[in-house]
Regions:
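A short, N-terminal "cap"/entry segment at the start of jelly-roll beta-barrel domains
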Residues: 4, 18-52, 85, 95, ...
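Bacterial N-terminal signal peptides
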Residues: 6-16
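A short beta-loop-beta micro-motif enriched in histidine and acidic residues
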Residues: 47-49, 61-74
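Short acidic-glycine-tyrosine-enriched beta hairpin
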Residues: 58, 88-105
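Histidine-centered metal-chelating micro-motifs
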Residues: 63-65, 83, 100-110
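Glycine- and acidic-residue-biased ligand/ion/polar-headgroup-sensing regions
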Residues: 70-88
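Ligand-binding loop in jelly-roll beta-barrel domains
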Residues: 104-130
Length: 144
């Protein structure tokens, strides 16, 4: 069962709130490098699914390995930049204030930009499934 419209509206509202400019000089939390899980729990409007939200603080030019998720991913860029590649599509550069939805099962990868990446990502995860599934790099064949 896929999450319904109420789940998507709630996620969109949450991401929209992140885009509201704040006062100058407001201190911003700086988590340790990596992905810090900040929220996780069941979604009442989508039985059989739970939401995981992460605060991403990725160092400059760090690779984002090939992977996919069993549920949808919603990524909102707060600072820095990232290059995302979805299998079968070209590179996409995302900058502060931009967001992307990645469909379930879509193999994707990328790298943080030259100044690193700060972002918030939310994943709608079917119960009993892992958050992320690693996908081995495709070997380059001679002549390609």
């Amino acid at each position: 069962m896929r999450p319904g419209l109420p789940v998507l509206i709630a996620l969109a509202a949450g991401l929209g709130a992140c885009a509201t400019p704040g006062p100058e000089g407001v201190a911003v939390y700086q988590p340790a490098p990596g992905i810090s899980e900040v929220l996780s729990g069941p979604i009442q409007a989508a039985p059989g699914h739970h939401l995981v939200t992460g605060d991403l603080n990725i160092p400059a030019n760090a690779p984002i390995p090939r992977h996919y998720h069993h549920g949808e991913e919603f990524l909102y860029i707060l600072g820095g930049s990232t290059v995302i590649v979805r299998e079968g599509q070209g590179e996409m550069t995302l900058r502060p204030g931009q967001a992307i939805r990645i469909a379930p099962g879509t193999v994707h990868w990328g790298r943080a930009g030259p100044k690193g990446l700060r972002a918030v990502s939310s994943w709608v995860v079917p119960d009993g499934q892992p958050l992320r599934v690693a996908v081995p790099e495709q070997p380059v064949r001679p002549g390609e």
